[in-house]
């Protein structure tokens, strides 16, 4: 079976992408990588272009373009470049891993395919513990429509392994129709639509962060620094994130039992596939951000940290943040 890794990037996200590819190869992963242009100025880094097959939207079929335009008709809260990840479903690969650029590989991703038998999608995140607040304006409606537990199958669309089948495209088009019929329920971005498609099509999902595997959370915000992450991987302490604790408290005693087994992992090595720096306005000021500079020389890395600090001191970061908030408000 043909398989590989799909990325989407442009010149603006180039340094993230460069670091991601560095971490993928450093882990020992030799899977082929295809990079789709996000739009705007394309990447020009030799370090990237030497490792990838570079593709543009025009390299895909007309059916693929029609599909993207259909998604765009309801997914109005994100740039169209975010939707180009879905072009991977129209490639000649049978299986693929899609990854956002603000991710660092912490293991050889070829190992993820060992878990794919019998599943449509394999992923490793704790999105399910947020109880739908980032995917839906009315999350309670999801369980009313699709049944109890439907929010607990949430996926972070930024990193997932997919075993393709034609039904997936049909289900995602059906999810577009569902968005049109229920405009007040979902947030208008790709992650919520993907989740609705999995519910409509009853996709077989495997979340490695759930029992029986209990992998560590892949969100960088759950770790203060590199030491805390390393100790968590070594099983030095029980890792229950803030969102997990909140979600766990809402469960019945019976439903808590599989998750209480997490305590048995203490002093045993625990797996983690990657770190995802999603939901971050900038990278650099926090200790755990160090991984995002792994591909850079010591001098370049320190200069980037210096620029971040200067931007904070001169209130440049604050001003940029306020401008973004105003733009989001005006575009609503």
Predicted features and spans:
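N-proximal low-complexity "stem/linker" segments adjacent to membrane-targeting elements
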Residues: 1-21
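Short internal beta-strands
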Residues: 33-39, 123-125
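Short, charged/polar "capping" segments at the starts of alpha-helices
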Residues: 15, 40-46
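GT-A fold catalytic core of metal-dependent nucleotide-sugar glycosyltransferases
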Residues: 83-133
């Amino acid at each position: 079976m043909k398989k590989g890794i799909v990325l989407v990037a442009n010149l603006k996200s180039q340094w993230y992408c460069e670091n991601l590819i560095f971490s993928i190869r450093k882990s020992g992963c030799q899977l082929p990588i295809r990079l789709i242009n996000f739009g705007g100025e394309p990447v020009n880094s030799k370090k990237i272009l030497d490792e990838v097959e570079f593709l543009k939207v025009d390299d895909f079929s007309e059916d693929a373009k029609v599909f993207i335009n259909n998604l765009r008709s309801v997914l109005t809260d994100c740039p169209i470049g975010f939707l180009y990840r879905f072009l991977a479903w129209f490639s000649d690969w049978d299986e693929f891993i899609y990854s956002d650029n603000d991710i660092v590989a912490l293991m050889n991703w070829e190992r993820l395919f060992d878990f794919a038998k019998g599943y449509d999608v394999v992923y490793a995140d704790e999105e399910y513990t947020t109880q739908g607040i980032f995917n839906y304006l009315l999350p309670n409606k999801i369980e009313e429509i699709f049944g109890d537990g439907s929010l607990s199958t949430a996926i972070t669309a930024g990193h997932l392994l997919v075993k393709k089948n034609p039904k997936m495209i049909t289900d995602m088009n059906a999810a577009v129709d569902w968005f049109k019929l229920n405009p007040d329920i979902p947030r208008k971005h790709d992650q919520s639509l993907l989740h609705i498609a999995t519910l409509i099509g009853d996709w077989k999902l495997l979340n490695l962060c759930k029992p029986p595997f209990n992998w560590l959370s892949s969100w960088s915000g759950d770790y203060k620094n590199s030491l805390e992450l390393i100790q968590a991987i070594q099983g030095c302490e029980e890792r229950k994130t803030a969102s997990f604790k909140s979600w766990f408290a809402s469960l019945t005693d019976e439903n808590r039992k599989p998750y209480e087994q997490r305590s048995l992992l203490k002093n045993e090595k625990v797996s983690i596939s990657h770190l995802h720096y999603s939901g971050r306005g900038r990278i650099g000021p926090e200790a755990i951000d160090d991984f995002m500079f792994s591909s850079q020389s010591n001098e370049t890395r320190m200069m980037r940290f210096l620029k971040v600090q200067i931007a904070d001191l001169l209130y440049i970061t604050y001003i940029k943040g306020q401008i973004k908030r105003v733009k989001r408000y005006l575009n609503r």
